[in-house]
Amino acid sequence: MKFVDVKNDIAFRKIFGNEQKTLILISFLNAILKLEGDQRIKEVTIINPYLLPRVAGEKASIIDVRAKDEKGQQFVIEMQVADVDGFDKRVQYYTCRDYSMQIDRGEQYPLLKPTYFIGILDFSFFDSPAYLSNHLILNEQTYEHTLKDIRFTFIELQKFHKTVTELQTLTEKWIFFLKNAENLDLIPENINDQGLIEAYKDADKHAWQKEELIAYDNASIAEQDERGKIIAAEKKGKIEEKEKVVKRCWQKKMPIKDIAEISELTIEQVQAILKKLEKQ
């Protein structure tokens, strides 16, 4: 077996947006949200099922998987591979929007059902070392949890370091799958949950159609391009900041040697920036 990178947009939607295998999504939600007893999800309806892009290279129109359970509760599961500006604002905006759009004007508020956002992040976002975190609306003084309809759960893959032999809970096994499936050749022996087993089977490249593999490769290229843009933007921002430091120091008549030390640049780099500033 050769597994795909589950973090890939096409792979993610194919596995979790499969209307024929909703047990995959049910298992994932119950494990990540740690639902027990009557709270456990028994059925889900996928609102935006998996579809291939219409043309080669087209960005997938569905970047997440949305579903409802038998109680009407909404779930938004999103894979985010890069830390883009405003990510936290967007998450809150779209989750609250989905919550409010459950009813039309004039309908009663009690019809609103809880909305859960699950963000799978391939980068570190919070300062905490925890790889799984839940964010609720709590009373600041008493920590009372009365406002329960909106909840955010984040999985930060870069903070998860357990090996396959260290996996104990189904939650850990799901997160291991998300992060490491592409590096495996077989389904781990300690995987006994049927939903997760089916997820591994759907992640097997040998079971994919040619069109799906092409779309998968296109999505991988698009992802690398996007990461490259972000890195380039960060690099440009750092260079511009260095130039500002050099300019301020030069205006204060500081020696080039001191400017280089303060800006953490070489003397040659400082001189090049000064020449550039002279031409402006």
What is the predicted function of each stretch?
Residues 1-280:
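Elongated, amphipathic alpha-helical interaction scaffolds
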